[in-house]
């Protein structure tokens, strides 16, 4: 298990029909996908567990008649969906921290298939939340990729285990049949960890015998200086640049000025370093922070409270059509470097929709060539210039009537 941010690999397509890269695009062909190895192995074990558990005559004496289950997923939530359909007396919560993945799974569960109804099971809830609800569970199922982010994995495991009733069971799996790391993590909860071997994965079962004595706080509080002000920042696992200020965010902050009454939008705000820094510069300006990650939005909101800022608003959004389009003076973003610039293009176009005529896009990148070539397709007066180990790219939304928003470059 390494420490890179967890981006699940694509599931394997099983012909049945929508490429869900955009969960809101109804024109694309949809496919029902088979679960990844770790999720399929976990599903097999969970089925056996539930068949045995629900078949016991005294099960209702040990649990409520409605078995409460929570699940995470490395794909489209196939294990949670299958359990909900096959065991209708259960109540299943499928939990994501990212709205894009939540919407993608919601759509996937409603695809017609040879063995699946086209409607979402009534006992399955698919939600995007920063944290698992503080509700008691009888079973938690947690498939994990061996290349996932360690702290996020530990956070998931701890939350799921903490929510279990005493006597409840955690079933976790990893796509590494020789795994030791996950096994060691589970032994921190209980000494007895049962193992189920699979060809492509390893599955573990842990029965909760006592409450956890202490919960580890995986959040991190740090501070950075911007324009002689100390900005307090809160980061969490699963949010970009956990436990540190991203250097790209620093370059973005250094590249722009804020003027009174300005309306700025921070697209893909992460933990909010750019939003918080700019909001502290001028209380008369307003900053709208948007992200698809519920934890990112949580971090920004908590950061605003910690810095006593009243001029920040937030929006959880995965489709790029943000509130109050065409009204912002400046859009700022730090696009990711993966995806052959497909994600970068979506963010640039989201900025274009958000800006007023004459508004300015400012972004930071380590790969300036694509922006030099493509920004002029949508913006005028485009600039790309070096900033430390990065480049700042900028352009103005076309208009002949409204003067452009000024850009202050670093010296």
Over which residues does each language-model region extend?
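Non-catalytic substrate-recognition/targeting regions of SAM-dependent transferases
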Residues: 2-29, 174-243
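Conserved proline-anchored active-site loop of SAM-dependent methyltransferases
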Residues: 139-150, 267-274, 328-340, 351
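A short glycine-rich, Lys/Arg-flanked "PGG" loop and its adjoining helix->strand segment in the class I
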Residues: 154-166, 346-357
């Amino acid at each position: 298990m390494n420490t890179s941010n967890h981006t699940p690999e694509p599931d394997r397509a099983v012909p049945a029909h929508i490429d869900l890269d955009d969960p809101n695009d109804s024109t694309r062909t949809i496919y029902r996908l088979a679960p990844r190895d770790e999720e399929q192995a976990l599903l097999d074990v969970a089925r056996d567990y539930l068949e045995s558990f629900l078949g016991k005559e005294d099960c209702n004496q040990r649990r409520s008649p409605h078995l409460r289950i929570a699940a995470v997923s490395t794909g489209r939530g196939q294990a949670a969906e299958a359990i909900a359909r096959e065991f209708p007396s259960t109540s299943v919560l499928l939990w994501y921290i990212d709205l894009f993945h939540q919407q993608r799974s919601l759509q996937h569960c409603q695809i017609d298939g040879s063995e699946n109804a086209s409607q979402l099971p009534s006992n399955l809830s698919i939600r995007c939340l920063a944290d698992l609800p503080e509700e008691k569970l009888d079973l938690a199922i947690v498939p994990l990729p061996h290349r996932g982010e360690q702290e996020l994995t530990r956070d998931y495991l701890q939350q799921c285990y903490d929510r279990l009733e005493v006597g409840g069971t955690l079933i976790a799996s990893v796509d590494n049949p020789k795994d030791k790391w996950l096994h060691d993590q589970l032994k921190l909860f209980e000494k007895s960890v049962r193992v189920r071997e699979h060809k492509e994965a390893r599955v573990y079962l842990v029965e909760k015998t006592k409450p956890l004595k202490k919960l580890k706080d995986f959040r991190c509080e740090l501070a950075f200086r911007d324009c002689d002000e100390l900005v307090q920042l809160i980061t969490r696992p699963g949010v970009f640049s956990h436990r540190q200020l991203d250097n790209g965010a620093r370059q973005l902050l250094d590249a722009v000025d804020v003027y009174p009454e300005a309306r700025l939008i921070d697209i893909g705000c992460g933990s909010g370093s750019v939003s918080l820094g700019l909001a502290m510069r001028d209380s008369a300006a307003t900053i709208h922070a948007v992200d698809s990650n519920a934890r990112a939005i949580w971090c920004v909101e908590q950061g605003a409270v910690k810095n006593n800022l009243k001029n920040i608003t937030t929006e959880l959004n995965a489709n790029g059509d943000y509130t109050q389009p065409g009204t912002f003076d400046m859009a700022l973003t730090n696009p990711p470097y993966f995806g052959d610039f497909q994600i970068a293009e979506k963010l640039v176009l989201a900025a274009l929709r958000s800006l007023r005529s004459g508004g300015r896009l400012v972004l930071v990148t380590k790969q300036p060539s694509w922006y030099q070539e493509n920004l002029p397709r949508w913006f005028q007066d485009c600039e790309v210039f070096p900033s430390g180990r990065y480049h700042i790219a900028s352009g103005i939304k076309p208009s002949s009537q409204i003067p452009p928003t000024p850009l202050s470059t670093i010296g």
